[in-house]
Structures are given as C-alpha cells and as structure tokens.
C-alpha cells in the first residue's frame, strides 16, 4: 500500500485533533478558556469576544476573536486544536453575510453590534 505525502501527514495529524469542539461560525460570540502559566501555577483565563475570521485547515485551523477592552480593540488568533486552548463555549450565534468581518475594525460603539441568529442551536 502506497500513500502520498499528504495522506501520511493527515494520518499523523488526526491523532492530535480535538473532537469535543463546538461548531463555530463567523459572527458568533464565544468564550475561550486559555491556559496561562504564571510563576509555577497554571490557570485558565477566559477570553470573550466575536469571531471575525476563521481559517480551516485540519490541525492548523484558527479563529480570530475580537473584543473591546478599556476602549481599545483587541484581536487574538487561536489555534483551535492547541493544548493551550482549554475550552470553547458559544454564547450567542451571530447573523452575518460575510466570511471575514474585518470591517468591524473601522466601526465604533453600537455600529459593531451583530444581529442574533436563532435558527442555529448553541
């Protein structure tokens, strides 16, 4: 049996994929639990925001989450299958018609709100 290089890579990566991830869509408001080591202690820091971009790609699947902290927009890119991501919880579904919501960077205040979507389960 001969396998090409991509099939070999996919079979090795499949062992490290997380199965317990919820379905995440662009526009959703999510809470990500990030493992942080401070001193000798390890704790989980919650990061809550709106998903403005998603990249599919097996083990290198990423989401970009944006939130406003003390009046400043903060964006963070998370590798979904990373061991640093302890948990992901979808808080509300957003109704959007774009794959990438980069236009939210230019908007301020109430203009950044996204309509809630009720036809998808949490």
Swiss-Prot record:
Keywords for this protein: Ribonucleoprotein, Ribosomal protein
One annotated Gene Ontology cellular component of this protein: cytosolic large ribosomal subunit
Coiled-coil positions: none
Transmembrane segments: none
Domain of life: Bacteria
Record-level GO BP terms: translation
Protein's UniProt keywords contain tRNA-binding: no
Signal peptide stretch: none
GO molecular function, one term: structural constituent of ribosome
Gene3D superfamilies registered for this protein in UniProt: 2.30.30.790
Family affiliation: Belongs to the bacterial ribosomal protein bL19 family.
Function: This protein is located at the 30S-50S ribosomal subunit interface and may play a role in the structure and function of the aminoacyl-tRNA binding site.
Name of the featured protein: Large ribosomal subunit protein bL19
